[in-house]
Amino acid sequence: MKNQKIRIRLKAFDYKLIDQSAAEIVDTAKRTGAVVRGPVPLPTRIRRYDVLRSPHVNKSSRDQFEIRTHQRLMDIVDPTDKTVDALMRLDLPAGVDVEIALQ
């Protein structure tokens, strides 16, 4: 797999979980002899929702909720076959979304 790179993008609501998963991926890739760039923290997406507290009147009284989506990006440069196999067998927590692209 010469002159290729694997781009991994992680998304999660909990920043501790995403940092732990990123560290696990970096350790696995380095153990197999690949060069890792990252993890690079991408901007956190904040979705805010305003909900009326009362079902009838009092429009000025609202509850505010938000969901924060944390993201990390990392590149694995010149991965070996060992690296790909190790990443396939890696078990990450359920709250982390992983997108892998081969470039």
From Swiss-Prot:
Family annotation (PROSITE patterns): RIBOSOMAL_S10 (PS00361)
GO biological process, one term: translation
Any GO CC annotation of this UniProt entry: ribonucleoprotein complex
Domain of life, source organism: Bacteria
Keywords tagged on the record: Ribonucleoprotein, Ribosomal protein
Keyword Ribosomal protein carried by entry: yes
GO molecular function: structural constituent of ribosome; tRNA binding
Subunit structure, as described in the record: Part of the 30S ribosomal subunit.
Family membership noted in the UniProt record: Belongs to the universal ribosomal protein uS10 family.
Role according to the record: Involved in the binding of tRNA to the ribosomes.
Identification of the protein by name: Small ribosomal subunit protein uS10
